[in-house]
């Protein structure tokens, strides 16, 4: 029986109409495609993908809170997303579910407590200062490459605390980019797999995945032979022991978690910082206030600075790196007027709820002050999901915020920027990446 007849399913696209009409927007820009559909159907709509897969896309706050927090035990990561992304990046925390996810989360969580992370702060600050000392200046500078390289070097050094050869870093970066591009095209074009018999694209990408894992395995092997103790995330993963057995993770499990940390740990921060600079470049008052903060406070105190945090939050509100997330219902469920069967995939569209007039005043305007109370202290906002929500809240959120605070403090102490008038183009991959960010950059120091 058609689920639309038995349940209360939001209006949306059938398989045929999805392919013929909606899909052309997804191929160009997933965020714009979903936004256009929200304008047509409202805050929640549905789509039936090939294979009779029912997907509900929502930017309704109560719906998002229900699936991610209030009734989270009824939801796992969707098989569709795990098959597509997990096939490339492994079964780490970002893609696993159920008892295995909980086991891994409990095992790894202690390594991300604030006191543990503070031991990595000096690594982050050293990398930030070195990068900004050589930061490109001039007219219409594309700031994405140096910031992406910085974020990548920070996560690699935090993971491994060794200087990897430049060629290895470049190879890892190229592999990640190619793997992401492949996965997103696969998800946005449901019939694309039919072309593989002619193109062998899937086999090419599997070879990329295998090469990536081989590089990680070599690094782990070298570390096991090294008698020194390192204050890095790899040592934490190698030394972690399961409570019930006292056993360590296997190399494959460690590689899964390393790949997830690399994927989430550099893409999200690099993207957010680039979006942030592109917005602040058009707001001289915000830039001046950041300069004053940077010149009158210590960089290590920036983590607790309310204004710096507010600027970062506002950037993540307007351009959330994690612009949506998925869950699959394990049993029939419903929210408000909607009811849907088990195996329904729910896509929580953070980008949309972050710009909803129901929750934000002047939602399309860059206003960091909205995150401050009357006393200038940082406040929490209910319709704000920069790192997800519920038990699966990003495990590295504190590390990411610290890294971004250090960068913002150091950047505006050293540099000033202005807009070129060219808006960055959104490039939604696994994260929301800017295609290019062209700014006029001048050095203060």
Listing of model-derived features with the role each one plays in the protein:
Residues 22, 45, 86, 113-115, ...:
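Conserved cytochrome P450 catalytic core segment spanning the I/J/K helices
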Residues 348-375:
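Conserved cytochrome P450 K-helix/beta-meander segment immediately N-terminal to the heme-binding cysteine loop
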Residues 2-39, 53, 61-65, 70-72, ...:
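Cytochrome P450 catalytic-domain helical core, especially the substrate-recognition surface
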Residues 7, 38, 128, 174-178, ...:
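Cytochrome P450 proximal C-terminal region
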Residues 266-293, 398-413:
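Cytochrome P450 catalytic-core helices
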Residues 21-42, 214, 218, 299-336, ...:
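Conserved cytochrome P450 K-helix E-x-x-R motif and the immediately C-terminal K′/meander segment
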């Amino acid at each position: 029986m058609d689920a639309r007849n038995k349940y209360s399913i939001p209006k949306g696209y059938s398989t045929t109409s999805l392919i013929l009409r909606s899909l052309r927007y997804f191929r160009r820009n997933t965020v714009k495609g979903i936004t256009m559909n929200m304008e047509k159907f409202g805050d929640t709509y549905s789509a039936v993908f090939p294979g009779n897969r029912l997907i509900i896309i929502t930017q309704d706050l109560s719906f998002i809170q229900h699936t991610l927090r209030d009734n989270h035990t009824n939801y796992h990561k969707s098989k569709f997303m795990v098959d597509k992304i997990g096939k490339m990046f492994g079964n780490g925390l970002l893609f696993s579910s159920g008892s295995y996810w909980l086991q891994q989360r409990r095992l790894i969580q202690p390594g991300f407590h604030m006191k543990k992370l503070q031991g990595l702060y000096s690594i982050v600050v050293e990398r930030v200062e070195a990068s900004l000392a050589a930061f490109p200046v001039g007219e219409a500078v594309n700031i994405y490459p140096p910031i992406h390289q910085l974020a990548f070097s920070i996560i690699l050094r935090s993971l491994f605390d060794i200087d990897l050869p430049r060629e290895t870093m470049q190879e890892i970066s190229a592999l990640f980019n190619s793997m992401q591009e492949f996965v997103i095209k696969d998800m946005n074009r449901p019939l694309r797999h039919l072309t593989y018999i002619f193109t062998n694209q899937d086999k090419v990408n599997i070879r990329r995945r295998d090469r990536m894992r081989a590089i990680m395995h070599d690094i782990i092997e070298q570390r096991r032979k090294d008698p020194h103790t390192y204050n890095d995330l790899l040592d934490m993963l190698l030394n972690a022991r399961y409570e019930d057995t006292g056993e360590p993770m296997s190399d494959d499990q460690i590689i899964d978690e390393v790949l997830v940390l690399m994927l989430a740990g550099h893409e999200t921060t690099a993207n957010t910082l680039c979006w942030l600079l592109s917005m602040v470049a058009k707001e001289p008052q915000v830039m001046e206030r950041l300069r004053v903060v940077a010149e009158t406070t210590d960089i290590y105190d920036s983590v607790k600075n309310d204004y710096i945090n507010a600027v970062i939050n506002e950037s993540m509100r307007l351009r959330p790196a994690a612009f949506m997330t998925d869950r699959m219902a394990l049993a029939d469920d419903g929210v408000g007027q909607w009811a849907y069967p088990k195996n329904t995939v729910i896509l929580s569209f953070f980008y949309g709820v972050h710009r909803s007039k129901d929750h934000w005043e002047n939602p399309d305007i860059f206003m960091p002050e909205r995150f401050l109370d009357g006393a200038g202290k940082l406040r929490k906002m209910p319709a704000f999901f920069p790192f997800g929500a519920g038990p699966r809240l990003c495990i590295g959120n504190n590390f990411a915020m610290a890294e971004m605070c250090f960068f913002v403090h150091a950047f505006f102490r050293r540099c000033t920027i202005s807009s070129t008038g060219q808006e960055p183009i959104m490039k939604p991959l696994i994260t929301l990446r800017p295609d290019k960010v062209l700014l006029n950059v001048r050095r203060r120091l």
